Amino acid sequence: MMNKKWWHNKVAYQIYPKSFKDTNGDGIGDIPGIISKLDYLKDLGVDILWISPMYQSPMVDNGYDISDYYAIDPMFGSMDEMKQLIKEAKKRNMYILMDLVVNHCSSEHEWFQKAMADPEGEYGSYFYIKDGKDGQPPTNWRSYFGGSVWEKIPGYDNKFYLHSFAKEQPDLNWENETVREKIYEMICWWMDQGLSGFRIDAIMNIKKDLTWSDLKPDGPDGLADVYKITGKVEGIGDFLMEMKHRCFEP
């Protein structure tokens, strides 16, 4: 028989911070705005707040391109205000979940900037960097946003990096144990700040088909959707169990 968890029989409400409540008149919702509506949300019967990304980001994909996992984007407020939100929610017996993106980061993230400066160095291994086929992409995979999943690295004739989404969202190499450990450290840090958990975006994409084989084209562009090399790959469960043991168990 399954033990009852804290989230069972709870009502969750998603907040898209940009459009929720603006308190400083700049036209963008902010953390103080969320705090100001906690009593209202509690009266509605809400127990859990799932908040879409508020991390530092160039906002190419509405915050799903994170350039610093440890910082709040100034458009939403400060880290002190985030801690205050968590504190005020707990006073009302409410729980805060944050959206988290760990399949990829922003191309402005420090790791990726270092990888581009030295693709064959330590940080290059944080991403999927492959040689092309005589200057053409390594495979014929199509990104979720259209076009090839491969982007040529500036200054190199035949090196490409993988991005399942926008080119500004390079995929992190989950096969690299150091990358996984850094992700788990970040998750644990946020839990230490008082978060109750996360909604993890695009998690099915973290395990790739490492044969790097072309697929049968499924469109006139000669490409095949990238989900075909993630949807049926063995091993994602191992990554998720490792994350569970490292981050979410006592």
Short names for language-model regions:
Residues 196:
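Receiver (REC) domain switch/active-site residues of two-component response regulators
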Residues 2-188, 192, 204-250:
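Acidic/aromatic-lined carbohydrate-recognition and catalytic surfaces
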